[in-house]
Amino acid sequence: MKVMQVIPKLGYGGAETGCYDLAHYLPENNCQSYIITSGGPLLKYIKKDKVKLFRLPVHSKNPLLIILNSIFISFIILFFNISIVHARSRAPAWSCLLATKFTRRKFVTTFHGTYNFNNSI
């Protein structure tokens, strides 16, 4: 199984730490791990021999960049044959939703905090 996580920045928060932990847990359990992020301080700790890393401006809420990101994410999904896409924030969730609709892959998203539960994502 190939799992790609998409997170705006790899800082030191809860979602970021969860992304880092899952990214390093997956290869130990016969899964391949991929991360798309725009950067962040945790990048230097990613074990690049275990996790494939891509840099895209997925932190942006600009509608044009969301569409462009979805195109790039679609190509990554198809080229690496990604099984599951996990978005860890609202901005990249829109790009991932479009990409997974186009590529017909599984899509999951998580959030923590107070958001409107009537949202389609």
Language-model regions: role of each:
Residues 1-121:
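Membrane-interface segments of envelope glycosyltransferases acting on lipid-linked substrates or membrane lipids
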